């Protein structure tokens, strides 16, 4: 009897309970009190938060360790030392710039000065170099520098001083019996005085003092008297 009364009371409560839904539809699911719903929602939120915390912890453990960056300005340096360092660095940079500018200025000079030995050798080959002097009957050779003489007269006087027999001071030799000849760059034997002195110095390779009788035909009588 009591069970029947309880069942009737539950049916009455269920019939009069407000529900969300269309009229005439019945909810067979048992209704839960509001307090229980809130407790279940809180438990679900706590479970989700715990799962999210676990995921974040796992991600942090899996991530590589962050490199330690050096603290700027450590160890501390006093202000007067900083100023000294700055002055030294500025002076070093200025000295490097000065050295580089000097090197850049010296490069064209060295490039232009490189052909100097070739130019000097060419000048020595063209004229003014030492030439050998030989004399018929003399047992030795001499060398003279043609750049030291301004003309044929000075050259003859120097040759007379070199060879005593050619000047007539010994053995009673007569200077008029000898003639001065030279060998040019082509190897031809020519009489001294047939060309200007500058041309002679640039083409003369060897001097020879020979007897005038052997030099006949090499030049005019005026040239043979030089």
From Swiss-Prot:
This is Auxin-responsive protein IAA12. Expressed in etiolated shoots and roots. Residues 42-51 have a biased composition (Low complexity). Keywords: Auxin signaling pathway, Nucleus, Repressor, Transcription, Transcription regulation. It comes from the Eukaryota. Gene3D superfamilies: Phosphatidylinositol 3-kinase Catalytic Subunit, Chain A, domain 1. It is found in: Nucleus. Residues 128-212 form the PB1 domain. Residues 22-57 are annotated as: Disordered. Homodimers and heterodimers. GO terms for biological process: auxin-activated signaling pathway; regulation of DNA-templated transcription; response to auxin. Aux/IAA proteins are short-lived transcriptional factors that function as repressors of early auxin response genes at low auxin concentrations. A motif (EAR-like (transcriptional repression)) lies at residues 18-22. SUPFAM superfamilies: CAD & PB1 domains. The keyword Cell membrane does not apply. Induction: By auxin. One of its GO terms (cellular component) is nucleus. Belongs to the Aux/IAA family.
């Amino acid at each position: 009897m009591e069970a029947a009364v309880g069942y009737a009371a539950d049916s009455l409560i269920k019939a009069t309970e407000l529900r969300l839904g269309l009229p005439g539809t019945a909810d067979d699911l048992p209704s839960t009190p509001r307090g229980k719903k809130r407790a279940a929602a809180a438990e679900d939120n706590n479970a989700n938060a715990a799962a999210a915390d676990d995921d974040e912890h796992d991600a942090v453990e899996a991530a590589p360790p962050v490199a330690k960056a050096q603290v700027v300005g450590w160890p501390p340096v006093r202000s007067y030392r900083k100023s000294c360092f700055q002055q030294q660095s500025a002076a070093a940079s200025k000295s490097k710039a000065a050295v580089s500018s000097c090197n850049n200025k010296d490069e064209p000079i060295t490039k232009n000065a490189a052909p100097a030995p070739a130019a000097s050798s060419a000048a020595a080959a063209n004229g003014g170099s030492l030439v050998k002097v030989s004399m018929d009957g003399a047992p030795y050779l001499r060398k003279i520098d043609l750049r030291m003489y301004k003309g044929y007269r000075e050259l003859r006087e120097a040759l007379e001083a070199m060879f005593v027999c050619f000047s007539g001071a010994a053995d009673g030799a007569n200077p008029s019996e000898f003639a001065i000849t030279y060998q040019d760059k082509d190897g031809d034997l020519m009489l001294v005085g047939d060309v200007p002195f500058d041309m002679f110095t640039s083409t003369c390779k060897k001097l020879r003092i020979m007897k005038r009788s052997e030099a006949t035909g090499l030049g005019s009588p005026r040239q043979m008297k030089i």
